[in-house]
Swiss-Prot record:
Region Disordered, annotated ranges: 311-331, 347-414, 512-536
Keyword annotations: Isopeptide bond, Methylation, mRNA processing, Nucleus, Phosphoprotein, Repeat, RNA-binding, Ubl conjugation
Cellular compartments per GO CC: cleavage body; mRNA cleavage and polyadenylation specificity factor complex; nucleus
Tissue specificity of this protein: Expressed in most somatic cell types (at protein level). Highly expressed in testis, except in meiotic spermatocytes.
Species this protein is from: Mus musculus (Mouse)
Region of interest called Interaction with RPO2TC1, as start-end residue ranges on this chain: 517-580
Upper classification of the organism: Eukaryota, Metazoa, Chordata, Craniata, Vertebrata
Protein name as annotated: Cleavage stimulation factor subunit 2
Residues the record lists as Omega-N-methylarginine modifications: R308, R471, R478
Statement: the UniProt record of this protein carries the keyword Repeat: yes
Length: 580
């Protein structure tokens, strides 16, 4: 011993240390330290553990401050009984013990010990896993505890330490997996996700090798902060962890368990955890926005779609379409087909509140509409209103004039005002129109009634009422009811169908024709008291004219129900008037 060069620090350390053998497996370093402190202050005591099993090998090394104390320990403590075993205390500088010390890298206290033998980056993950697995549970727990404190107290220093020692970060992650603080799957994801994180490793850049080395350390940092993200994901993992997932490499080789603890004691990577986690989150977020955008793109204004659906393809005058179309459940109306203008357009001021939708301004002779004779006029055009109200307001066929009250009609149309406007726009003489329409069908009312009865029992009745009731505006038995409360209008209700809102539109055209015809026929049959033709009569006459003048193409575009009712009406009118 005396011949050994004392100038070499490593040798000096070995001279100050003693080898302790035959240690009971259940003994702890603290207990042994207490025993060896009897001869003098102990700098460090270290038990040696099997890296494969993590169990103690039954021997260790005790380092004193000077060689004299070490010699005293060998003299006084050799053979000391502890837990039923006689401790063997020998010189740590012996050839055999020297080799042991060298392989374990225990030449100095834990805090000062080097990393140990260097290994290739490819083998680093496995080495780290073995080193971590060899740590006894209590030591592993202590390691995590120290790391937590380090991160809490010195986040930046801890971060730097882990960045510069990726193997430590990886070991901490592995330890968390073994302790079931972090789920193995999550650990793998963290490692792989952060491969793009630059690693600031000093010395050998062994970090990367299978699962994103650089990222490994950083990732672990996240997890090192047990309190942080890692603690959140609790999963179970086998003790040895997944070396494959750990791709950070140890520059110096596997840190000894004690060394790791010491290293952990250093500043903690507080910010690391956040950074790693943030990155993972960011990656995920990236994908999030895209789907959303995609979802948004398809979004369209529902109203636009409705309007489009409503627009008739061949409507000559789309002017009123916008107004009507959107509400038309069928996506189209007579009006749209006939190219009529939006009823509301010519209505002028909005209907009074008590009035319903101006839809049934059916009079539809909008200024822009074709001349009264043009059946395409607004009248038919707006079946929707009727749909809304099965009773089809303005078309109250039962009352001679549309609704004697005109504007009071639930739709709020001022029949008279509308008619006046419509007539003016067309430049038609109200009376002339009435004369024409009524004359043409003066006799027709009764004939129509008979035919209509076959196709539309209700309509026939309504017509009959009109044809027979010469009193004109005076409400007949089925006359219009008080404003806003219309009983079922036979005409408005589909033929034979009880006020089905869906048929109302169809019948509206027909009903209107019938009504106007009847109204028109009344001029001839007006009783003395009714020498005047009311605006409603003109309105109805105009409606009939519009229906009659619908072209075959326009009729073909209508829904089957409307088309059928209009064809029947035209046929009946032609038969009754003898028109071609």
């Amino acid at each position: 011993m005396a011949g050994l060069p004392v100038r070499d620090p490593a040798v000096d350390r070995s001279l100050r240390s003693v080898f302790v053998g035959n240690i009971p497996y259940e003994a702890t370093e603290e207990q042994l330290k207490d025993i060896f402190s009897e001869v003098g202050p102990v700098v460090s005591f270290r038990l040696v553990y099997d890296r494969e099993t993590g169990k103690p090998k039954g021997y260790g090394f005790c380092e004193y401050q000077d060689q004299e104390t070490a010699l005293s320990a060998m003299r006084n403590l050799n053979g000391r009984e502890f837990s039923g075993r006689a401790l063997r205390v020998d010189n740590a500088a012996s050839e055999k013990n020297k080799e042991e010390l060298k392989s374990l890298g225990t030449g100095a206290p834990v805090i000062e010990s080097p990393y140990g033998e260097s290994i290739s980056p490819e083998d680093a993950p496995e080495s780290i896993s073995k080193a971590v697995a060899s740590l006894p549970p209590e030591q592993m727990f202590e390691l995590m505890k120290q790391m937590k404190l380090c991160v809490q107290n010195s986040p930046q220093e801890a971060r730097n330490m882990l960045l510069q020692n990726p193997q430590l970060a990886y070991a901490l992650l592995q330890a968390q997996v073994v302790m079931r603080i972090v789920d193995p799957e999550i650990a793998l994801k963290i490692l792989h996700r952060q491969t793009n994180i630059p690693t600031l490793i000093s010395g050998n850049p062994q970090p990367v090798h299978v699962a994103g080395p650089g990222s490994g350390p950083n990732v672990s940092m996240n997890q090192q902060n047990p309190q942080a993200p890692q603690a959140q994901s609790l999963g179970g993992m086998h003790v040895n962890g997944a070396p494959p997932m750990m791709q950070a490499s140890m520059p110096g080789g596997v840190p000894a368990p004690v060394q790791m603890a010491a290293a952990v004691g250093g500043p903690g990577p507080g910010s690391l955890a956040p950074a790693g986690v943030m990155q993972a989150q960011v990656g995920m977020q990236g994908a999030g926005p895209v789907p959303m955008e995609r979802g948004q793109v398809p979004m369209q204004d529902p109203r636009a779609a409705m309007q489009r659906g409503a627009l008739p393809t061949n409507v000559p005058t789309p002017r009123g379409l916008l107004g009507d179309a959107p509400n038309d459940p069928r996506g189209g109306t007579l009006m749209t087909v006939t190219g009529d203008v939006e009823p509301r357009a010519y209505l002028g001021p909005p209907p009074p509140p008590h009035q319903g939708p101006p839809m049934h301004h059916v009079p539809g002779h909008e200024g822009r509409g074709p001349p009264p004779h043009d059946m395409r006029g607004g009248p038919l055009a707006e079946p929707r209103p009727l749909m809304a109200e099965p009773r089809g307001p303005m078309l109250d066929q039962r009352g001679p004039p549309l609704d004697a009250r005109g504007g009071r009609d639930p739709r709020g149309l001022d029949a008279r005002g509308m008619e006046a406007r419509a007539m003016e726009a067309r430049g038609l003489d109200a009376r002339g129109l009435e004369a024409r329409a009524m004359e043409a069908r003066a006799m027709e009312a009764r004939a129509m009634e008979a035919r209509a009865m076959e196709a539309r029992a209700m309509e026939a009745r309504a017509m009959e009422a009109r044809g027979m009731d010469t009193r004109g505006p005076v409400p007949g038995p089925r006359g219009p009811m008080p404003s806003g409360i219309q009983g079922p209008n036979p005409m408005n209700m589909g033929a034979v169908v009880p006020q089905g809102s869906r048929q109302v539109p169809v019948m509206q055209g027909a009903g209107m024709q019938g009504a106007s015809m009847q109204g028109g026929s009344q001029p001839g049959g007006f009783s003395p008291g009714q020498s005047q033709v009311t605006p409603q009569d003109h309105e109805k006459a105009a409606l009939i004219m519009q229906v009659l003048q619908l072209t075959a193409d326009q009729i073909a575009m209508l829904p089957p129900e409307q088309r059928q009712s209009i064809l029947i009406l035209k046929e009946q009118i032609q038969k009754s008037t003898g028109a071609p």
